[in-house]
Structure formats: C-alpha cells, structure tokens
UniProtKB/Swiss-Prot annotation:
Keywords: Amino-acid biosynthesis, Chaperone, Chloroplast, Diaminopimelate biosynthesis, Lysine biosynthesis, NAD, NADP, Oxidoreductase, Plastid, Transit peptide
Tissues in which the protein is found: Expressed specifically in leaves.
Consequence of gene disruption: Impaired chloroplastic NAD(P)H dehydrogenase (NDH) activity, probably due to a reduced stability of the NDH complex.
Main location: plastid
Gene: DAPB3
Organism of derivation: Arabidopsis thaliana (Mouse-ear cress)
InterPro entries listed in its UniProt record: DapB_C (IPR022663), DapB_N (IPR000846), DHDPR_bac (IPR023940), NAD(P)-bd_dom_sf (IPR036291)
Domain of life, per lineage: Eukaryota
Protein name per UniProt: Dihydrodipicolinate reductase-like protein CRR1, chloroplastic
Miscellaneous: Unlike DAPB1 and DAPB2, DAPB3 is unable to complement an E.coli dapB strain.
Residue positions binding NAD(+): 160-163
Amino acid sequence: MAAVNCHFFQLSRHLKPSRPSFSCSASQPSQNNIKVIINGAAKEIGRAAVVAVTKARGMELAGAVDNHFVGEDIGLLCDMEEPLEIPVVSDLTMVLGSISQGKEVGVVIDFTDPSTVYENVKQATAFGMKSVVYVPRIKPETVSALSALCDKATMGCLVAPTLSIGSILLQQAVIMASFHYNNVELVESRPNAADLPSPEAIQIANNISNLGQIYNREDSSTDVQARGQVIGEDGVRVHSMVLPGLPSSTQVYFSSPGDVYTVKHDIIDVRSLMPGLLLAIRKVVRLKNLVYGLEKFL
C-alpha cells in the first residue's frame, strides 16, 4: 500500500488570517529504485526473494514470472500481509517490455533452469536489463556463451554458484587452510539426492586443487567406495550424505599429526540466501560484463 504524505502550509501573515491548510498525496516509488523482475517467483527461493526485495531499500518488485500459479497475486502467494497487485505471469518478454519503456534501471533474477537461462539472459539484455543468475548445475559452456553475449552487448550479468555469504566465507577459509595441511576431506549432507556431490562440494574441491598441494598421500586409493569420491587430481575426498530433515550442511576437515581444523557451514532456511541476493542486485547494476561468483564483491 502506498504511504500517504501530508504537507502543511501556513498562510502568509500578509493575507487574511486563516487556518493552516494541508494537502495529501499518495507517495509513488522512487524513480531511482532498481526495478527487479523475479523469474521463477513461485519457487521457494523465488518467494523468499519477493519478500526480501519488497522490504529492501532502493529497489522494488516490478514483475513475477513463473509457469505455475499464473494470474495469482505474488504477494498473497508469498503470505504477505497485503497483496502487491502484481500477478504471476508466464511471459518474461511482456514484463521486460513494460519496464524498458520507462528507461529505468532493471535487474532480472533468474531462478529457472540450466536449459532456459541463456535465452532468459539474452531477452533481458535485449531490453537493456542486467541479470543475476542463480541456477544450480549451470554448465561451463553456458557460462562462456553468456560471457560472450554480455561482452558484445556491454551488459552486466552476475552468475552466482551460491548466494550464501556463509558458504563463500567457508570457501575462503578452506583455501587459506589448504596451504598448511596435507590431509583434507569434505563431508556434506543434503535433504535430497538431486545432485551428489553437490555443486558447492565440487567447487570447494576445485578451489583447493592445482595449488601445488597433494592431499591424503597416505591413503590415495580410489578402490574402496566407502572412502568417498576423489574430486580432481590432487586427492580431495568428498563424502555425500542424504539426510531428509537436516539442514544442508558442509564440513571440511583438515588434519596433521596432533591437529584437526574443521570448517562448517549450515543452511537452515532459504532466507539465509537473501543478503547475498540483495548484494548481487546492487552490484550487478554497475557491471558491463559477466562476473562469475558473488565472492568478487565481498
């Protein structure tokens, strides 16, 4: 609901004495606000993003796109106190067209699917809109194609393997520790078995590979499946567990004789990703090319 601002005006003393007069007008959203379109708005993370963007300073929700719940008010779908008067639509192009006519700064958040993300960013770019992409399992060749597209169009795009600031801090701590320990194993738990090892686990293993360190020299065998999967050529072992009911958890164990260093991070709720998402929105509007990884802005 728009806020109402009331301004009082005292009449000049040179005129006839009179009571003060006032006028009221419903305030409109600032023209400087970042207009945000959420593609995949009906998903759990999309709904959390709707709430976060609506409450954030300097940005406003301009569109909700999804193939499910078409026609429903996105505010009511997200259990907000009042409707946002923004219906869910299935046509991204229609929303992009309405925003681009106002020549306002716009960002499309993409929570969709690896198979559609390139076309989504291409459409957003054609309408002069920046993109934030959080699509697990996105292929490296897709990222390369997006990078070429953004370079040609001089348009910003942020591809984020994770929006979790805690996860990024864990990865940074792991890289630092890898220079001081020769033994490392990663244990993760996920509520479902959609992707194992998870993209995050693979990224952590890749981050600490090719740093001139060979890990777990005394147990380099890959014959025993119970010892986990070796990722990369430097011996990083990953153990993946599927435990419904528990939070998504990542633990990295480093050890040397008489010393164990453990780094752990849990994601209990999708809302934990929202600070990272809002940071991504604020940073991508200044970009003129593709940047891979939210950690570039921490």
